């Protein structure tokens, strides 16, 4: 017989049941059908799909936020050697050096201007070959408040320690079946290289430059496990500071490494050139296709102008293209922004964000936006021909380019004169396929210039016979990156090949001698040096023949490399006493040759 429960027992048992219900696990359901008391078996398949779709949307939005402000040159880094905008010979040279990796060549020095793909080529080839790079990065000098002595080493000392650790403590080296030591490989057989993409801040006055050279020299002589790949960006800045400006602003392989290291047989030097326009157009076109930008004649013109204005710097061209595309969203207005939001139009997140900010500023009476509009109207030309000059890279002409503009002496009407001369001499022979020797071409040029040589003897007739020059003297001198004395020395080495007669060579040589006498070494006068350089350039352009015989030749500047080496020995003495400009060329180029010091005017007074 079932015993009847008392009221106390029944209430106690009901409380236990309620407690058991409370500790049940809550179920995962969709937002529309949430119920805390539902069990796990109540979840439907539609709810699981909705939950996963919502999760994917959140991940996609996070990725968009990360890529919104990403620069294109970082977003579209080449992943294969075939995608590099570098000449195939340069790529094959780096690849062959990395595959060989012999003790006879311990250092690969890659030099070139900025944005020509030096570091990218090394990283892509290392990844493609399965090699790893031990990269040196300049550390930040940060000190903890609790420990002020935690970072007492200088940057040069840190670099020396890094190189010594790489050479002293390499990874485990294995032996193959023939007991031959595998050089430069780790325990997994993966080859490694020391990659110096950045170098410490160097100065010859505090000894850091000499310390850097000693570290590299020690690494070459040691029998370490890893070879070294160094990337050096060469810079030639405008000479606008007068004395010592060329020595302090220049940044090339000769001044950093030194002549003894560059001539070392264990050092391989590879010179990179600026990116060719064909490679640059191909790269920019690929980026535009990936970004979904539609083709148009205006876009093609924009790419052409950016390629011509970037001076072979691919990184600068990509940044200019990204900035130009972002400005196009501002001109199109709110319609494109709405289309991109609704998914009807194509566009990148960076351009969308920039257009939204500009739209918000344009609707408000903001002083910043007013200044922005005034800035655009003042500094961006409105003509179609120069509409992209705002993105032009501020670079110099370069040493050889500036000297070449002078010695080639281009004037108005040169093409017509050359065309008329080709019709008068040997043009019929070239049509038939008969080659003309260089001596015959020189004789033809001399015969064609006979009337000009007669006019050169009379100065009055010479003034009236010269056509207008196409060389801008001021921009050529300012963008050469050379001091006045070095620029005059470059003209002195290269003017002879442009002359046809001895009279022309005599006149140019006499004028360069007079211009050299106009400048003073002590006391140094920047105005006098500038006037002397103007006089030498203008006189050389005046006395050279027009047109200059068109033939292939290589410009020479033999003393430039030696100047950077020998000049460093006497920098301190020249700066203190002001005897001469540090940037003046030193004719005595041999290091073992003893140079006589200039007489001290203070000692002469005694």
Swiss-Prot record:
Gene Ontology MF terms: ATP binding; ATP hydrolysis activity; chromatin binding; DNA clamp loader activity
SUPFAM superfamilies given in the database record: P-loop containing nucleoside triphosphate hydrolases
DNA damage as UniProt keyword: yes
One GO-annotated biological process of the protein: mitotic intra-S DNA damage checkpoint signaling
CDD domains attached to this UniProt entry: AAA (cd00009)
Keywords: ATP-binding, Cell cycle, DNA damage, Nucleotide-binding, Nucleus
Compartments (UniProt record): Nucleus
Stated role: Participates in checkpoint pathways arrest of the cell cycle. A mechanism that allows the DNA repair pathways to act to restore the integrity of the DNA prior to DNA synthesis or separation of the replicated chromosomes.
NCBIfam families, per database record: rad24 (TIGR00602)
Protein name listed in UniProt: Checkpoint protein rad17
């Amino acid at each position: 017989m079932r015993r009847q429960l008392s009221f106390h027992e029944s209430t106690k048992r009901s409380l236990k049941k309620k407690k058991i219900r409370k500790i049940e696990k809550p179920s995962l359901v969709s937002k529309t059908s949430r119920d805390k008391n539902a069990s796990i078996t109540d979840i439907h398949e539609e709810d699981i799909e909705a939950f996963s779709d919502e999760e994917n949307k959140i991940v996609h939005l996070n990725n968009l936020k990360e890529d919104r402000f990403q620069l294109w040159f970082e977003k579209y880094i080449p992943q294969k050697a075939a995608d590099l905008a570098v000449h195939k010979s340069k790529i094959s040279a780096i690849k062959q050096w990395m595959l060989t990796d012999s003790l006879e060549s311990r250092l690969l020095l890659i030099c070139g201007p900025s944005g020509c793909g030096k570091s990218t080529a090394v990283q892509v080839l290392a990844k493609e070959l399965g090699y790893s790079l031990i990269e040196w990065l300049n550390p930040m000098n940060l000190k903890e408040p609790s420990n002020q002595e935690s970072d007492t080493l200088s940057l040069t000392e840190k670099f020396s320690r890094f190189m010594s650790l790489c050479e002293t403590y390499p990874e485990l080296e294995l032996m193959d079946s023939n007991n031959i030591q595998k050089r430069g490989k780790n325990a997994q057989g993966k080859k490694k290289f020391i990659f110096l993409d950045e170098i410490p801040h160097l100065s010859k006055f505090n000894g850091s430059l000499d310390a850097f050279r000693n570290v590299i020299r020690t690494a070459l002589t040691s029998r370490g496990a890893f070879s070294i790949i160094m990337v050096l960006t060469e810079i030639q800045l405008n000479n606008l500071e007068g004395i010592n400006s060329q020595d302090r602003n220049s940044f090339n392989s000769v001044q950093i490494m030194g002549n003894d290291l560059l001539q070392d047989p264990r050092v391989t030097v590879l010179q990179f050139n600026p990116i060719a326009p064909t490679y640059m157009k191909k790269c920019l076109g690929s980026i535009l296709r990936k970004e979904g930008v539609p083709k148009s004649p205006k876009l093609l013109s924009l790419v052409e102008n950016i390629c011509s204005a970037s001076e072979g710097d691919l990184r600068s061209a990509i940044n200019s293209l990204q900035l130009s595309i972002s400005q196009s969203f501002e001109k199109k207005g709110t319609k494109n922004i709405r289309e991109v939001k609704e998914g009807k139009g194509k566009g990148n997140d960076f351009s969308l964000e920039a257009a939204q900010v500009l739209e918000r500023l344009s609707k408000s009476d903001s002083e910043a936006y007013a200044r922005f509009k005034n800035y655009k109207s003042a500094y961006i030309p409105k003509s179609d021909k120069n509409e992209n000059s705002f993105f032009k890279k501020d670079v110099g002409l370069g040493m050889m380019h500036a000297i070449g503009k002078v010695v080639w002496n281009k004037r108005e009407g040169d093409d017509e004169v050359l065309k008329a001369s080709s019709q008068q001499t040997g043009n019929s022979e070239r049509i038939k396929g008969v080659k003309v020797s260089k001596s015959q071409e020189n004789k033809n040029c001399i015969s064609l210039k006979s009337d000009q040589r007669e006019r050169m003897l009379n100065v009055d007739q010479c003034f009236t016979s010269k056509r207008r020059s196409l060389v801008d003297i001021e921009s050529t001198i300012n963008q050469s990156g050379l001091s006045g004395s070095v620029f005059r020395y470059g003209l002195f080495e290269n003017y002879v090949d442009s002359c046809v007669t001895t009279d022309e060579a005599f006149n140019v040589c006499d004028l360069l001698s007079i211009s050299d006498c106009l400048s003073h070494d002590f006391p140094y006068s920047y105005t006098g040096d500038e006037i002397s350089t103007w006089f030498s350039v203008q006189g050389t352009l005046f006395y050279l023949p027009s047109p200059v015989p068109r033939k292939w030749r290589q410009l020479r500047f033999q003393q430039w490399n030696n100047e950077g080496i020998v000049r460093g020995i006497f920098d301190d003495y020249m700066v203190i006493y002001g005897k001469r400009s540090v940037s003046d060329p030193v004719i005595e180029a041999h290091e073992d040759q003893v140079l006589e010091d200039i007489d001290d005017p203070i000692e002469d007074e005694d």
